[in-house]
Amino acid sequence: AALDSGIQVKLNCVPQAGVNEGELEQLAALAETLPLEVRFIEMMPIGSGASMPCLAGPDVLARLQRRWPELTLLPQKPEPEFALGPAIYYKVPGWKGSVGFIAAVHGKFCAGCNRIRLTSQGFLRLCLASEAGCDLRTPLRSGASDAELLDLLRNAIREKPLEHHFGETGIPATRGMYRIGG
């Protein structure tokens, strides 16, 4: 129904060793006949994801390129009214859709990340891999003006971490992704 209505559809998959690795080619093949984006998202080593058997983005790409050697990198395109997102897209000539990769660990895109998240508790998270952010609930409930809230947002975003530190020893896994909007 969404595709028939012209709504852009993105189908996300987190490839996991021994869980869904046998389905990756079938998922990618959906983009052959359907105008959608099939995106493979690398498991972030956060919370329980730190101990899950994940597949690296470059390994999934190599696997799909063996199946479809003509899988070609697409030029980065800006999302409507937004800066570039974290996905890198590929397409087989003649396909209606594309295949994307979001590889936070093996394709660090921090420098170009334009994402922030607001938790259900009113905390603005600047990065999924960091506890950095600011409380927006308190000023909202205290009647802060739009200008004051905008100032808070701007100041917080200026503090957005430059990069994550996955792979460094001694970095504890933070809350589970389901608790931080990931």
Where do the PLM segments sit?
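Short hydrophobic/aromatic-rich motifs at helix boundaries and adjacent loops
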Residues: A1, T33-P35, K108-F109, L124-R125
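Radical SAM enzyme [4Fe-4S]-AdoMet core and its adjacent flexible, acidic
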Residues: L3-G100, A104, L140
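Active-site oxyanion/phosphate-handling segment shared across diverse enzymes
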Residues: P93-F123
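Flexible mid-to-C-terminal extensions adjoining Fe-S/redox cofactors in radical SAM and related proteins
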Residues: A111-G182
